[in-house]
Amino acid sequence: MDFVMKQALGGATKDMGKMLGGEEEKDPDAQKKEEERQEALRQQEEERKAKHARMEAEREKVRQQIRDKYGLKKKEEKEAEEKAALEQPCEGSLTRPKKAIPAGCGDEEEEEEESILDTVLKYLPGPLQDMFKK
């Protein structure tokens, strides 16, 4: 019967004791092996990061060659120039630049009101039109 149980369970009988709360076998070199494994993982990670940095440097070099060839600017440089242009006041102008004026502000509303008033005045008889225009 013992033979049949061992064959049915395979090598799981050794692990059964561990699963039921028994003590694990103590490996005298387990801590040393774990440290070696951690060191190997750390080295692999460093190598991966170094490889990634080299590849990114090569890509940036190619990007810069393309920018130089076609006279393009980096996105950050372009944004900085646009921002500086907006902040710099126009020479001889006492007003803000048009882009700095928020939408809905300014003379647009007054023009709409005047056009509505003009439309209403057109439908009034002549003497009333004269009264409202004064």
Swiss-Prot record:
Phosphoserine PTM positions: S93
GO cellular component, one term: SNARE complex
UniProt cross-references to InterPro entries, sorted A to Z: Synaphin
Subcellular location: Cytoplasm, Cytosol; Presynapse; Nucleus; Perikaryon
Keywords for this protein: Cell projection, Coiled coil, Cytoplasm, Differentiation, Exocytosis, Mast cell degranulation, Neurogenesis, Neurotransmitter transport, Nucleus, Phosphoprotein, Synapse, Transport
Annotated GO biological process: cell differentiation; mast cell degranulation; modulation of chemical synaptic transmission; nervous system development; positive regulation of synaptic plasticity; regulation of exocytosis; regulation of synaptic vesicle fusion to presynaptic active zone membrane; synaptic vesicle exocytosis
Coiled-coil ranges per UniProt: 28-84
Lineage top rank: taxon: Eukaryota
PANTHER family according to UniProt: COMPLEXIN, COMPLEXIN-2
Name of the protein in question: Complexin-2
Gene source species: Homo sapiens (Human)
